[in-house]
Amino acid sequence: MKLKKEIKDIDLMLLLATIFLIIIGLVAVTSASFPTAKKYNLNSFHYLARQSGFLVIGIIALFMIIKMPRAVIYKNIEWIFPMSIILILLLWSPLGDKSKGQVRWLDLKIIRFQPSDILKLSSIIYLAKYLAKNIYSLRDRKTFLMAVGIMGISVGPIMIKDFSTAVVIGVALFAILLASGITKKQFLFLVILGIGLIYVILKDPENKFRIMRILGFVSDSTDYQSAALYQSRQSLYAFALGGYSGVGLFRSRQKYTNLPEAYTDFIFSVIAEEFGFIGTFIVILLFIIYIYRGYMIAFKATNYFDKFTAIGMTTYIGIQAFFNMGVCAKILPVTGITLPFISYGGTALVMALVSTAILLKISKEGTLWNTFYPVAVLGDIYILP
């Protein structure tokens, strides 16, 4: 009865899409991680057990966010955002753990996690709050440059260490700025600035491996042979082997030796091989439903803070899913971006559920929230006309 009360009035389609994606993820992780578990003499369900543990944490966080007053998120983002930046800066210290050519992990001995997953959410909420407070002065140069500064602080520290994640964050924040009604000149400024930053990063000698990835992807030539190009080709073989209906659950061959990141970066390829076109179509359809419902929640929002937050959260999930599936289908160069809700990874799963919880909360309490709270708690947030 209590559970029924909590989920009343929330966006049911978004919730169901999330549930089905998680179920598919648990099944896929079980299958894709089997060779790795066997290689290290672990229990066959080792990775499933760990992922399930993080899922429980994520579900608890989801219900806590749905129940807590919205003002808690609004007020505490003032220190959560700076703390997430500090965690990113720690990647430059000995605590930063290099993996697959990029420093994504922070190893604190007792816990190992990706601070970028926390930054994705905190930067979205922080920028949403700033723009909601200053929506009618955004065309003022100072206000706009402050918003650009928030983007720079969010993307800059992580861009060298984890370029692809920086792009995901940048696109999500850019989507919020677009929704805020920036001028054509401001839009062009952001585009030129983004292209310039990408050029500077790729020109850095330390990022030579990224250039090789791009050249190998574009030319598909043996002159640019690399582990990334090899993985892309093996991923395509997995799609080909899967055909229309797949080879069957646990029967993938590619996951044994040809796809080293089978249960993380290339889990979509394992799904394609074991469940074929039908399986990949279902996954893509679920993400389309999720993204559509997320943007509809943003469209129906009655204050700017809700609107911008929903747009940012939805874009982050959507662009990350697109990048991962695009890499697996070899329409994008290898990025190291995982598939939300499906790929193995504790921090990513928990943060994806937190973002979903925020979307569900906006859908559940939108009208009630905007009727009673803007003056008392969010007095500096403008209600949409």
Annotate the PLM regions.
Residues 1-16, 20-21, 27-161, 325-340, ...:
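Membrane-helix boundary/helix-loop-helix interface segments in multi-pass membrane proteins
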Residues 32, 145-177, 203-207, 272-279:
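Helix-loop-helix junctions and helix-breaking kinks within/between transmembrane helices
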Residues 53-58, 274-291:
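Hydrophobic alpha-helical transmembrane segments
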Residues 60, 68, 97, 126, ...:
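Transmembrane alpha-helix boundary/anchor motif
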Residues 99, 103-105, 188-281, 302-305, ...:
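Hydrophobic, glycine- and aromatic-enriched re-entrant/interface helices and adjoining loop segments
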Residues 131, 167, 172-186, 250-279, ...:
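Interfacial segments of multi-pass membrane proteins
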Residues 167-178, 192-195, 288, 355-357:
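Hydrophobic transmembrane alpha-helices of multi-pass, membrane-embedded glycosylation machinery
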Residues 296-336, 342:
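Loop-to-helix entry and N-terminal half of a specific, functionally important transmembrane alpha helix
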